[in-house]
Regions:
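N-terminal juxtadomain amphipathic helix
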Residues: 1-13
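Catalytic center-proximal scaffold of phosphoryl-transfer enzymes
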Residues: 13-356
Length: 356
Protein backbone atom coordinates (compact mmCIF):
# COMPACT_ATOMS: atom_id res chain seq x y z
CA UNK A 1 0.00 0.00 0.00
CA UNK A 2 1.28 3.47 -0.92
CA UNK A 3 0.88 6.02 1.86
CA UNK A 4 1.89 9.63 2.35
CA UNK A 5 5.01 8.26 4.07
CA UNK A 6 5.91 5.80 1.34
CA UNK A 7 5.13 2.17 0.55
CA UNK A 8 3.91 0.00 3.42
CA UNK A 9 3.38 -3.76 3.38
CA UNK A 10 -0.02 -4.64 4.81
CA UNK A 11 -0.98 -8.13 5.95
CA UNK A 12 -4.70 -8.69 6.32
CA UNK A 13 -7.15 -11.56 6.38
CA UNK A 14 -8.65 -12.75 3.09
CA UNK A 15 -11.87 -14.76 2.99
CA UNK A 16 -13.49 -16.58 0.11
CA UNK A 17 -17.01 -18.01 0.04
CA UNK A 18 -17.22 -21.19 -1.99
CA UNK A 19 -21.00 -20.95 -2.12
CA UNK A 20 -21.36 -17.43 -3.55
CA UNK A 21 -17.85 -17.26 -5.04
CA UNK A 22 -17.22 -13.86 -3.45
CA UNK A 23 -14.03 -12.75 -1.72
CA UNK A 24 -13.98 -10.61 1.41
CA UNK A 25 -11.33 -8.34 2.89
CA UNK A 26 -12.72 -6.99 6.18
CA UNK A 27 -9.70 -4.75 6.79
CA UNK A 28 -10.16 -3.01 3.45
CA UNK A 29 -13.81 -2.33 4.21
CA UNK A 30 -13.00 -1.06 7.70
CA UNK A 31 -10.40 1.50 6.59
CA UNK A 32 -11.86 2.36 3.16
CA UNK A 33 -9.07 0.79 1.11
CA UNK A 34 -10.14 0.35 -2.52
CA UNK A 35 -6.76 -0.12 -4.21
CA UNK A 36 -3.07 0.36 -3.46
CA UNK A 37 -3.52 4.05 -2.54
CA UNK A 38 -4.06 4.51 1.20
CA UNK A 39 -7.15 6.40 2.46
CA UNK A 40 -4.86 9.08 3.85
CA UNK A 41 -3.05 9.61 0.55
CA UNK A 42 -6.14 9.61 -1.69
CA UNK A 43 -7.20 13.19 -0.88
CA UNK A 44 -3.69 14.41 -1.66
CA UNK A 45 -3.56 12.53 -4.97
CA UNK A 46 -6.97 13.88 -5.96
CA UNK A 47 -6.04 17.40 -4.91
CA UNK A 48 -3.01 17.24 -7.20
CA UNK A 49 -5.16 15.84 -10.03
CA UNK A 50 -7.72 18.58 -9.45
CA UNK A 51 -5.19 21.40 -9.49
CA UNK A 52 -2.98 20.35 -12.39
CA UNK A 53 -2.81 18.09 -15.47
CA UNK A 54 -2.27 14.48 -14.44
CA UNK A 55 1.33 14.32 -15.66
CA UNK A 56 2.25 17.52 -13.82
CA UNK A 57 0.34 16.34 -10.77
CA UNK A 58 2.33 13.09 -10.64
CA UNK A 59 5.76 14.32 -11.66
CA UNK A 60 5.82 17.68 -9.92
CA UNK A 61 2.93 18.72 -7.65
CA UNK A 62 2.48 15.47 -5.73
CA UNK A 63 6.20 14.93 -5.39
CA UNK A 64 6.65 18.44 -3.99
CA UNK A 65 3.69 18.05 -1.63
CA UNK A 66 4.70 14.74 -0.11
CA UNK A 67 7.69 13.19 -1.82
CA UNK A 68 5.42 10.40 -3.10
CA UNK A 69 6.09 9.23 -6.63
CA UNK A 70 3.14 7.92 -8.64
CA UNK A 71 2.53 7.53 -12.35
CA UNK A 72 0.28 9.92 -14.23
CA UNK A 73 -2.09 7.03 -14.96
CA UNK A 74 -2.43 6.31 -11.23
CA UNK A 75 -3.24 9.95 -10.50
CA UNK A 76 -5.78 9.92 -13.35
CA UNK A 77 -7.41 6.69 -12.19
CA UNK A 78 -7.60 7.81 -8.57
CA UNK A 79 -8.90 11.30 -9.35
CA UNK A 80 -11.55 10.12 -11.78
CA UNK A 81 -12.59 7.30 -9.46
CA UNK A 82 -13.17 9.64 -6.54
CA UNK A 83 -14.83 12.16 -8.82
CA UNK A 84 -17.27 9.48 -9.93
CA UNK A 85 -17.96 8.61 -6.31
CA UNK A 86 -18.76 12.26 -5.65
CA UNK A 87 -21.01 12.50 -8.70
CA UNK A 88 -22.93 9.38 -7.67
CA UNK A 89 -23.47 10.82 -4.21
CA UNK A 90 -24.74 14.15 -5.54
CA UNK A 91 -27.05 12.51 -8.08
CA UNK A 92 -28.49 10.50 -5.20
CA UNK A 93 -29.36 13.77 -3.49
CA UNK A 94 -26.77 13.38 -0.73
CA UNK A 95 -24.95 16.68 -0.49
CA UNK A 96 -21.51 16.75 1.10
CA UNK A 97 -21.64 17.81 4.74
CA UNK A 98 -18.89 20.27 5.68
CA UNK A 99 -16.35 19.22 8.27
CA UNK A 100 -17.35 22.17 10.44
CA UNK A 101 -20.54 24.14 11.03
CA UNK A 102 -21.34 26.96 8.60
CA UNK A 103 -23.89 29.23 10.31
CA UNK A 104 -23.42 32.05 7.80
CA UNK A 105 -25.88 30.43 5.39
CA UNK A 106 -28.84 30.98 7.70
CA UNK A 107 -27.88 34.06 9.71
CA UNK A 108 -30.39 36.97 9.50
CA UNK A 109 -30.03 39.22 6.46
CA UNK A 110 -30.71 42.90 6.05
CA UNK A 111 -34.25 43.74 4.97
CA UNK A 112 -34.89 42.68 1.39
CA UNK A 113 -31.70 40.65 1.08
CA UNK A 114 -31.93 36.98 0.07
CA UNK A 115 -30.40 34.19 2.11
CA UNK A 116 -28.41 33.33 -1.01
CA UNK A 117 -28.11 33.94 -4.72
CA UNK A 118 -28.26 31.21 -7.33
CA UNK A 119 -26.12 31.39 -10.45
CA UNK A 120 -26.26 29.10 -13.47
CA UNK A 121 -24.26 29.17 -16.69
CA UNK A 122 -22.33 26.91 -19.06
CA UNK A 123 -18.87 26.76 -20.58
CA UNK A 124 -17.41 24.69 -23.40
CA UNK A 125 -15.18 21.67 -22.82
CA UNK A 126 -12.91 20.34 -25.61
CA UNK A 127 -13.88 16.73 -26.31
CA UNK A 128 -11.99 13.80 -27.77
CA UNK A 129 -13.48 11.86 -30.65
CA UNK A 130 -12.85 8.39 -32.00
CA UNK A 131 -9.22 7.28 -32.35
CA UNK A 132 -8.08 10.24 -30.24
CA UNK A 133 -9.37 12.69 -32.83
CA UNK A 134 -11.00 16.02 -32.12
CA UNK A 135 -14.72 16.21 -31.49
CA UNK A 136 -17.20 19.01 -31.01
CA UNK A 137 -16.99 20.90 -27.74
CA UNK A 138 -19.68 20.13 -25.18
CA UNK A 139 -21.26 22.57 -22.80
CA UNK A 140 -20.73 21.81 -19.12
CA UNK A 141 -23.16 23.57 -16.80
CA UNK A 142 -21.97 25.20 -13.59
CA UNK A 143 -24.25 26.27 -10.75
CA UNK A 144 -23.45 28.43 -7.74
CA UNK A 145 -25.14 29.07 -4.43
CA UNK A 146 -23.51 32.06 -2.73
CA UNK A 147 -24.11 34.42 0.16
CA UNK A 148 -24.88 38.10 -0.56
CA UNK A 149 -21.46 39.17 0.71
CA UNK A 150 -19.80 36.76 -1.80
CA UNK A 151 -17.70 35.28 1.01
CA UNK A 152 -19.13 31.75 0.79
CA UNK A 153 -20.01 29.73 -2.31
CA UNK A 154 -21.02 26.21 -3.23
CA UNK A 155 -20.16 25.10 -6.78
CA UNK A 156 -21.83 22.25 -8.66
CA UNK A 157 -21.34 20.99 -12.23
CA UNK A 158 -23.00 18.58 -14.63
CA UNK A 159 -23.47 18.08 -18.35
CA UNK A 160 -27.23 17.66 -17.79
CA UNK A 161 -29.02 20.91 -17.01
CA UNK A 162 -32.01 19.44 -15.18
CA UNK A 163 -29.80 17.17 -13.08
CA UNK A 164 -27.76 20.17 -12.01
CA UNK A 165 -30.83 22.24 -11.18
CA UNK A 166 -32.06 19.40 -8.96
CA UNK A 167 -28.75 19.46 -7.11
CA UNK A 168 -29.08 23.21 -6.56
CA UNK A 169 -32.34 22.62 -4.73
CA UNK A 170 -30.80 19.83 -2.65
CA UNK A 171 -27.78 21.99 -1.87
CA UNK A 172 -29.94 24.90 -0.72
CA UNK A 173 -31.77 22.57 1.65
CA UNK A 174 -28.51 21.08 2.89
CA UNK A 175 -27.19 24.47 4.02
CA UNK A 176 -30.48 25.23 5.77
CA UNK A 177 -32.30 27.35 3.17
CA UNK A 178 -35.71 25.69 3.05
CA UNK A 179 -37.83 28.36 1.34
CA UNK A 180 -37.39 29.24 -2.32
CA UNK A 181 -38.56 32.75 -1.43
CA UNK A 182 -35.18 33.15 0.30
CA UNK A 183 -33.34 32.74 -3.03
CA UNK A 184 -32.75 35.03 -6.00
CA UNK A 185 -31.38 33.65 -9.26
CA UNK A 186 -29.17 35.90 -11.41
CA UNK A 187 -28.44 34.44 -14.85
CA UNK A 188 -27.80 35.60 -18.37
CA UNK A 189 -30.26 34.93 -21.18
CA UNK A 190 -28.84 31.51 -22.02
CA UNK A 191 -31.33 29.06 -23.45
CA UNK A 192 -33.18 27.10 -20.77
CA UNK A 193 -31.30 28.34 -17.69
CA UNK A 194 -34.15 30.18 -16.01
CA UNK A 195 -36.67 27.50 -16.97
CA UNK A 196 -34.56 24.70 -15.48
CA UNK A 197 -34.27 26.51 -12.16
CA UNK A 198 -37.98 27.23 -12.07
CA UNK A 199 -38.82 23.60 -12.82
CA UNK A 200 -36.62 22.21 -10.08
CA UNK A 201 -36.92 24.94 -7.42
CA UNK A 202 -40.24 26.72 -7.92
CA UNK A 203 -42.19 28.38 -10.70
CA UNK A 204 -42.26 31.61 -8.68
CA UNK A 205 -38.50 31.73 -8.13
CA UNK A 206 -37.34 35.34 -8.31
CA UNK A 207 -35.01 35.72 -11.28
CA UNK A 208 -32.90 38.64 -12.47
CA UNK A 209 -31.45 38.97 -15.96
CA UNK A 210 -27.77 39.80 -15.81
CA UNK A 211 -27.56 43.52 -16.50
CA UNK A 212 -24.34 43.31 -18.50
CA UNK A 213 -25.69 40.55 -20.71
CA UNK A 214 -28.76 42.66 -21.46
CA UNK A 215 -26.62 45.72 -22.17
CA UNK A 216 -24.49 43.71 -24.61
CA UNK A 217 -27.58 43.09 -26.74
CA UNK A 218 -28.19 46.83 -26.99
CA UNK A 219 -24.57 47.46 -27.96
CA UNK A 220 -24.58 44.71 -30.58
CA UNK A 221 -27.70 46.10 -32.24
CA UNK A 222 -26.34 49.65 -32.23
CA UNK A 223 -23.19 48.54 -34.03
CA UNK A 224 -25.18 46.83 -36.78
CA UNK A 225 -27.61 49.72 -37.09
CA UNK A 226 -25.36 52.78 -36.77
CA UNK A 227 -21.84 51.46 -37.35
CA UNK A 228 -19.40 50.45 -34.65
CA UNK A 229 -17.12 53.47 -35.00
CA UNK A 230 -19.79 56.15 -35.35
CA UNK A 231 -20.46 58.70 -32.57
CA UNK A 232 -24.19 58.09 -33.04
CA UNK A 233 -23.65 54.44 -32.10
CA UNK A 234 -21.99 55.33 -28.81
CA UNK A 235 -24.64 57.94 -28.05
CA UNK A 236 -27.54 55.57 -28.69
CA UNK A 237 -25.97 52.82 -26.58
CA UNK A 238 -25.57 55.24 -23.69
CA UNK A 239 -29.16 56.42 -24.02
CA UNK A 240 -30.69 52.94 -24.30
CA UNK A 241 -28.67 51.52 -21.42
CA UNK A 242 -29.68 54.51 -19.31
CA UNK A 243 -33.36 53.82 -19.97
CA UNK A 244 -32.94 50.16 -19.01
CA UNK A 245 -30.90 50.89 -15.89
CA UNK A 246 -32.96 53.79 -14.54
CA UNK A 247 -36.48 52.84 -15.71
CA UNK A 248 -36.43 49.11 -16.43
CA UNK A 249 -37.40 46.73 -19.19
CA UNK A 250 -40.92 48.02 -19.84
CA UNK A 251 -39.60 51.52 -20.46
CA UNK A 252 -36.88 50.17 -22.72
CA UNK A 253 -39.40 48.25 -24.81
CA UNK A 254 -41.40 51.44 -25.29
CA UNK A 255 -38.18 53.21 -26.24
CA UNK A 256 -37.28 50.49 -28.77
CA UNK A 257 -40.74 50.44 -30.33
CA UNK A 258 -40.47 54.19 -30.78
CA UNK A 259 -37.43 53.86 -33.02
CA UNK A 260 -38.03 55.26 -36.49
CA UNK A 261 -36.17 53.00 -38.91
CA UNK A 262 -36.23 54.77 -42.30
CA UNK A 263 -37.63 53.02 -45.39
CA UNK A 264 -34.18 52.25 -46.75
CA UNK A 265 -33.08 50.33 -43.66
CA UNK A 266 -31.41 47.05 -44.64
CA UNK A 267 -33.00 43.67 -44.03
CA UNK A 268 -30.11 42.80 -41.69
CA UNK A 269 -30.79 45.78 -39.44
CA UNK A 270 -34.54 45.10 -39.41
CA UNK A 271 -33.91 41.47 -38.45
CA UNK A 272 -31.56 42.48 -35.64
CA UNK A 273 -34.15 44.98 -34.44
CA UNK A 274 -36.83 42.29 -34.44
CA UNK A 275 -34.60 39.95 -32.42
CA UNK A 276 -33.69 42.70 -29.95
CA UNK A 277 -37.33 43.55 -29.24
CA UNK A 278 -38.15 39.85 -28.93
CA UNK A 279 -35.30 39.34 -26.48
CA UNK A 280 -36.51 42.04 -24.12
CA UNK A 281 -40.14 40.97 -24.47
CA UNK A 282 -39.13 37.45 -23.46
CA UNK A 283 -37.15 38.73 -20.48
CA UNK A 284 -39.25 41.73 -19.42
CA UNK A 285 -40.34 39.97 -16.19
CA UNK A 286 -36.75 40.03 -14.91
CA UNK A 287 -35.52 43.45 -16.03
CA UNK A 288 -36.99 45.72 -13.34
CA UNK A 289 -33.55 47.05 -12.48
CA UNK A 290 -34.69 50.17 -10.57
CA UNK A 291 -36.57 47.97 -8.10
CA UNK A 292 -33.73 45.47 -7.85
CA UNK A 293 -31.24 48.21 -7.08
CA UNK A 294 -33.59 49.82 -4.56
CA UNK A 295 -33.77 46.45 -2.80
CA UNK A 296 -29.99 46.17 -2.77
CA UNK A 297 -30.03 43.07 -5.00
CA UNK A 298 -27.28 42.00 -7.35
CA UNK A 299 -27.97 42.64 -11.02
CA UNK A 300 -24.78 41.08 -12.39
CA UNK A 301 -23.73 37.45 -12.70
CA UNK A 302 -20.02 38.10 -12.18
CA UNK A 303 -19.60 35.39 -9.51
CA UNK A 304 -21.05 32.80 -11.88
CA UNK A 305 -18.83 33.81 -14.78
CA UNK A 306 -15.82 33.72 -12.48
CA UNK A 307 -16.85 30.27 -11.24
CA UNK A 308 -17.01 28.94 -14.79
CA UNK A 309 -13.48 30.20 -15.40
CA UNK A 310 -12.11 28.75 -12.15
CA UNK A 311 -13.56 25.31 -12.86
CA UNK A 312 -13.01 25.45 -16.60
CA UNK A 313 -9.31 26.29 -16.46
CA UNK A 314 -8.58 22.72 -15.31
CA UNK A 315 -10.32 21.35 -18.40
CA UNK A 316 -9.03 23.80 -21.00
CA UNK A 317 -5.27 23.46 -20.78
CA UNK A 318 -3.14 23.39 -23.90
CA UNK A 319 -3.86 20.27 -25.94
CA UNK A 320 -6.45 18.89 -23.52
CA UNK A 321 -9.24 16.71 -24.89
CA UNK A 322 -11.72 14.86 -22.72
CA UNK A 323 -14.20 12.04 -22.83
CA UNK A 324 -17.43 13.05 -21.14
CA UNK A 325 -17.07 10.93 -18.00
CA UNK A 326 -13.50 12.07 -17.43
CA UNK A 327 -14.39 15.74 -17.75
CA UNK A 328 -17.43 15.36 -15.50
CA UNK A 329 -15.55 13.60 -12.72
CA UNK A 330 -12.59 15.99 -12.64
CA UNK A 331 -14.89 19.02 -12.85
CA UNK A 332 -16.97 17.67 -9.95
CA UNK A 333 -13.89 17.41 -7.73
CA UNK A 334 -12.70 20.82 -8.89
CA UNK A 335 -16.08 22.32 -7.97
CA UNK A 336 -15.91 20.63 -4.57
CA UNK A 337 -12.41 21.97 -3.93
CA UNK A 338 -13.22 25.58 -4.82
CA UNK A 339 -16.31 25.38 -2.57
CA UNK A 340 -13.93 25.65 0.37
CA UNK A 341 -11.85 23.61 2.77
CA UNK A 342 -14.69 22.52 5.10
CA UNK A 343 -16.61 20.94 2.20
CA UNK A 344 -13.52 19.32 0.68
CA UNK A 345 -12.53 17.89 4.05
CA UNK A 346 -16.10 16.80 4.69
CA UNK A 347 -16.11 14.63 1.58
CA UNK A 348 -12.98 12.75 2.63
CA UNK A 349 -14.22 12.22 6.18
CA UNK A 350 -17.31 10.37 4.95
CA UNK A 351 -17.47 6.57 5.01
CA UNK A 352 -16.12 5.41 1.66
CA UNK A 353 -18.79 4.13 -0.71
CA UNK A 354 -17.90 2.89 -4.15
CA UNK A 355 -19.76 4.50 -7.03
CA UNK A 356 -22.44 2.22 -8.42
Amino acid sequence: MVTAHGAVRVKRAYYYCGRCHQSFLPYDDAVGLVDEISPGLRPLVCLAGTLAPFADAAEDVLKRFSGVRLSASTVLRTTEGEGERLRAQLKDGRMVEPAQAEPFWTKPRDDGQPAAYVGLDAFSVPMQGLRAGKAEHRMLYAALLYTPDKEHTRYLVDFELNTLAEQVRAQAGAVGIEQVSQLIAVTDGGNGLEEALQRQLAANLTTVLDWYHAAEHLCAFAKVWLGADEPACVAWQHEAKGVLYERGGDALLAHLRGLDLPPGTSAEVREEYRKLVGYFEHNRHRTDYPTYRANGWDIGSGPTEAGCKIIGERLKGSGMRWVEDGAATVAALRALYVSGGPVWDGFWSQPHRLAA
